[in-house]
Amino acid sequence: MLRAAQAILDLPETAYGTPAGTLAALGAALRRAIAGSSGPFYATALLRASRRLADIAEPSARDWAAAFRNAVDSISELGGAHAGDRTMLDALVPAADAFDRALDSDRDPASAWAAAVEAAEHGAQETARMTPRAGRASYLGERAIGTPDGGAVAVSYWLRALQTHVR
């Protein structure tokens, strides 16, 4: 996460011109900065979200929710994992679901994002009870039980970090 954070901090100001451009720049930076499979997963997710927002100058909360859903789906498509496999998707899928549900209930974007963060944190903690079926932890089998999945926990951290910026 430290390398990812530094890669984001090192982006030039020009990377933040549009929502779609920002997401694409973040994806490229994270692809280079994060080792293992997480780098390509994050890069693909951010690029997919970027494409969803490409023609929208000022995305609405629903536009962001659709972009988030596209990003989450792209990780599952690329890696073949699903919620319940004890991966980052066990935080991402509940977060996307909660964000959608909260917006459908006419909650404001900040409140909807708070629900997403809570769902991600709960999902990440639930991975401690799961036997890994995908990802690097799958090699550990039942020995992984008792410790939350690192990828899911990382997701919950960065979703929480974004919370103060959602209005």
Where does each model-flagged region fall?
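N-terminal loops that bind phosphate or other acidic moieties
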Residues: 1-167
